[in-house]
Regions:
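Short proline/glycine-enriched turn/loop motifs at strand-loop junctions of beta-rich domains
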Residues: 16-22, 49
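Substrate-binding/active-site clefts of carbohydrate-active enzymes
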Residues: 77, 96-103, 112-231
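Residue-level detector of conserved, well-ordered beta-strand and adjacent loop positions
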Residues: 16, 35, 87, 143, ...
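Short beta-strand elements bearing conserved aromatic residues within extracellular beta-rich modules
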Residues: 23-25, 54
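Predominantly extracellular/luminal cell-surface or secreted proteins
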Residues: 26-28, 59
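Active-site-proximal helices and loops of the catalytic beta/alpha 8
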Residues: 28, 41, 182
Length: 231
């Protein structure tokens, strides 16, 4: 559910927020009302363009929320508490010939982007790919890179599944790393966490039944089979 783009004759921006009575979208500082449709959906003809930042305001029947990031954000340039940004999906890939590596042939190196290089970024990892290739490594596994609170973190309390940590270089930095790794015959494997959200920066419960009453040491449990999970 969450957010979806709809293209009919004109593009529209839709968000699923059954917990809200009303909703607005803020695009580069300007508020626009969203129209309620069926099943907890709200829609708006104002659509942010790539590079524009946006956030949502939700009315719970009593008061308006503070600006909230997109629950399905692709990029959080100011961190998990800030506005979301529309990401352009085009990229000048050079790895068209890449065909992957059989599991039985993999020589795997697990690394943490934030500490693997002095820069603590995807570009910093690129600078050490030749070193890894010389070791005989042909696959790297990245500890989780989904957005988390702060600048450095193990990654296991991320809150935005579809985005990439801004301090590591964001989605463009990850694309550059994957492309550079493939050019050296190195596969890239992502370590991901899908059973919980981190304790800071998770606003999804304000939109709808995305979490349950359960809790882990890392944060709220994702609502996979509880009330509202089949909405």
């Amino acid at each position: 559910r969450l957010v979806r783009w709809v293209f009919v004759t004109t593009p529209r921006f839709n968000i699923w927020a059954p917990a809200a009575h009303s909703a607005r979208i803020i695009i580069d500082g300007t508020e626009h009302d969203m129209r309620a449709t069926n099943g907890g959906w709200f829609t708006c003809d104002e659509v942010p363009s790539p590079g524009q930042r946006y956030a949502f305001l939700l009315f719970d029947g009593t008061s308006w929320s503070t600006p909230l990031p997109d629950p399905r954000t692709r990029y959080q340039p100011e961190g998990v508490h800030g506005p979301s940004e529309v990401v352009a999906t085009d990229f000048a890939w050079t790895d068209e010939a890449w065909g992957g590596i059989e599991l039985k042939d993999q020589v795997l190196y697990e690394l943490h982007v934030g500490t693997f290089s002095p820069e603590g970024t995807f570009d910093g990892v690129i600078g050490k790919l030749d070193y890894l290739a010389d070791l005989g490594v042909n696959a790297i596994e990245l500890l989780p890179v989904q957005p988390f609170a702060g600048e450095r973190n193990w990654g296991y309390d991320g809150v935005d599944w579809f985005a990439v940590q801004h301090s590591y270089g964001g989605p463009e930095g990850l694309k550059r790393l994957v492309d550079a790794a493939h050019a050296r015959g190195i596969a890239v494997i992502m370590d991901v966490v899908y059973n919980h959200f981190g304790p800071e920066g998770n606003y999804k419960g304000l939109f709808g039944p995305y979490t349950t009453a359960g809790h882990t040491a890392w944060g709220d449990v994702v609502n996979i089979s509880g009330p509202g999970s089949d909405e």
